[in-house]
Amino acid sequence: MRSEFWQNILDRAGKSEDGKQLPFFSLAPMEAVTDVVFRHVVSSAAEPEVFYTEFTNASSFASPKGIHSTRGRLTFTPDESEKLIAQIWGSRQADIEFMSQELPKLGFQAIDLNFGCPDKAVVKSGGGSGMIRTPALAEEIITAAKTSGLPVSVKTRLGYSRPEEFHEWLKFLLGQDVEVLTVHLRTKKEMSKVPAHFELIDEIVKMRDEVAPNTLLQINGDIKNHQQGMELWRAHSGVDGIMIGRGIFEDPFCFEKFDIEHSRQDYMNLLNQHLDLFDKHNTEASPRKFEPLKRFFKIYVRNFKGASDLRARLMLTKNTSEVRQILTEFGENYEDMMENYARISEEYHKNKNSEEV
């Protein structure tokens, strides 16, 4: 029986004109990226049906010393509760059980277990894609998470070293009665260095249909936007969800259902919103470091003349006030700058043509 949380997700995804269930879209959980601030920025640009928190270590959460450092990762606002999933990881059954049972008290309605992170430190500790090599432990971790009473899902990879490992590994996971199985279509060894194995989607769908027809299947890897996701869904019947990860860095509007051209000001508005939200959530109780904010500048400051110079200036800032000042100056001088670009370009082409003659 499907949980109310996931049924609501499917209902929000809607039906096609012929009555077929449309896929739900989600933003992949990403370290130091998918926090409460960025999730709200993405929502305002084009909202997917599902969000995930940054992945949070259960052992740190269970530790008296680490509990405060992990709480910030789990911060969310009331309007997110119907679409936000807490993604957790770890290799200690007791810690997973403790954290899973605490999550409902924090207001979470669903849990996702990270069995796919390829980070060396995570894998060495037995977590992330290290679980692929220890299925017995993976089963214990899933069982521990289920003690929360919340719907439990798993995000993983095809295998550890070889794509063919999916035959055993994914079949094993499908036998664990998880609500959703998200498959990053690469192995741990492949990282993101090779193209995602879209050619295996149909085999995975068939396996799901045979082993666990009630488990929702979500695919991830090399999917840049909503349009590409829909193309994959149409080409591979049986896929229930589409997860976009790095595509968000190329286009913050990637969840838009139609290809819309956005102006420079549209991107600047998102950046200003990000700054406002950063300041709003930067409190004494939950202080935020400014330096990590700089990694987001390239998402918004791109694909227009002067973007490279503007980014270079922004990277030298020390606080949001300095960023706002530079953005204001840039906006006020933009028209003059464009005239200079046009003049320089015209002179360049004149000189080039005269040389050719």
Segments the model singles out, each with a brief description of its role:
Residues 2-16, 30-102:
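Glycine-rich, positively charged N-terminal anion/phosphate-binding segment
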Residues 1-21, 25-26, 31, 37, ...:
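Alpha/beta catalytic cores of nucleotide-metabolism and tRNA/nucleoside-modifying enzymes
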Residues 30-32, 56-58, 89-91, 116-118, ...:
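Active-site beta-loop-alpha junctions enriched in small/polar residues
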Residues 25-28, 51-53, 84-88, 111-113, ...:
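Hydrophobic faces of well-ordered beta-strands that scaffold small-molecule active sites
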Residues 66-67, 77, 120-129:
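An active-site metal/cofactor-coordinating segment within enzyme catalytic domains
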Residues 97-111, 115-125, 136-217:
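Alpha/beta enzyme core
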Residues 126-132, 190-191, 259-261:
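Short glycine-enriched, charge-decorated loop/helix-capping segments at active-site entrances
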